[in-house]
Amino acid sequence: MAHITINQYLQQVCEAIDTRDGASLAELVSFKHPHVANPRLQMASPEEKCQQVLEPPYDEMFAAHLRCTYAVGNHDFIEAYKCQTVIVQSFLRAFQAHKEENWALPVMYAVALDLRIFANNADQQLVKKGKSKVGDMLEKAAELLMGCFRVCASDTRAGIEDSKKRGMLFLVNQLFKIYFKINKLHLCKPLIRAIDSSNLKDDYSTAQRVTYRYYVGRKAMFDSDFKQAEEYLSFAFEHCHRSSQKNKRMVLIYLLPVKMLLGHMPTIELLRKYHLMQFAEVTRAVSEGNLLLLNEALAAHETFFIRCGIFLILEKLKIITYRNLFKKVNSLSSASSRYLLLKTHQLSLDAFLVALKFMQVEDVDIAEVQCILANLIYMGHIKGYISHQHQKLVVSKQNPFPPLSTVC
């Protein structure tokens, strides 16, 4: 395949179309396949050759593909992206003409994937040249992919096996990757609705479902829906291929903060296994209610956490750390009160002030203590109320600090 002639290549294309062999045709138009490195196929003007062998719109599609290999050979990703848009547009015309059949879905997967990759590469080249702002090409690529998605979603006449709807999840995942990259997460919402209401949602491949759950879980995390985030990210982690250590680590980067916000702290063994020791001191700080250590841990690994987009989520752990610190204050106070036969469910606000000063919280006073306690009560982390008259926190006699998993 690396040394075939243009005529042999086009003959293989023709045969794959005639026999409706989607898998073979997908290879012949994919940049994952070795034919793209063949200098005989890297042509600046292949139109005439393609028109001699292929019917429209396949002649236009494969002429654009050969021009694309030529552009990539010259490291011109701006031109490669332009060619890839022509490939997708001409494929879409052919795909729409395939009534009640979906044999070309593998071809759609190949051209859609390459479109996203070339859009990303073109963006980088254009930004370097100062001709575009970040994400412009990706945004245009998303519009094209939405065209493919609409064709798949509107295929209501075909039976389940032959339905183009089977291609919806792959496209949604490609769109998610773009929307996360260009920071337009609100555009994910209608796509999530479409998949969740689909009667095919359990028929997609495990790999596609893992990718889908990973992105929807991340979106739920940013929306502060931590229970859904935990459910979706846990599914992605548990169903990742056993050998995909890198992918499992990627899921954990988002699953760990969610789990911690729900009160489930990771073990040091897990953090070591997936090379995520950046979370070790954060975990210890939250568990111990150690605000000083938490601030130090967040500062020490700030670059990593910001790059992963989780720094602001981890900042939310401060309220959990306050809760755990105040729970310790409550336990110590209750123990001494029982010894002195005093009321164990009333705590002086001064006790919390001392604890916060010990943790080197800056400029803290009783008003700040009341504010933190009011927040914890409002969020359900403490069952009780503040008696301003007596400057005390009055907590419930039963379960004053409910488990975090019942609160978030």
From Swiss-Prot:
Q: Does the keyword Glycoprotein apply?
A: no
The PCI domain extends over 210-400
Q: Which GO terms describe its biological process?
A: negative regulation of gene expression, epigenetic; negative regulation of lymphoid progenitor cell differentiation; poly(A)+ mRNA export from nucleus; post-transcriptional tethering of RNA polymerase II gene DNA at nuclear periphery; protein transport; spleen development; transcription elongation by RNA polymerase II
- Main location (coarse class): cytoplasm
- Its domain of life? Eukaryota
Gene Ontology cellular-component annotations: cytoplasm; nuclear pore nuclear basket; nucleus; transcription export complex 2
Q: How does it assemble?
A: Component of the nuclear pore complex (NPC)-associated TREX-2 complex (transcription and export complex 2), composed of at least GANP, 2 copies of ENY2, PCID2, SEM1/DSS1, and either centrin CETN2 or centrin CETN3. The TREX-2 complex also associates with ALYREF/ALY and with the nucleoporin NUP153. Interacts with BRCA2. Interacts with SRCAP chromatin remodeling complex component ZNHIT1; the interaction results in inhibition of SRCAP complex activity, preventing the deposition of histone variant H2AZ1/H2A.Z to lymphoid fate regulator genes and restricting lymphoid lineage commitment.
The name on file for this protein is PCI domain-containing protein 2
Q: Which gene encodes it?
A: PCID2
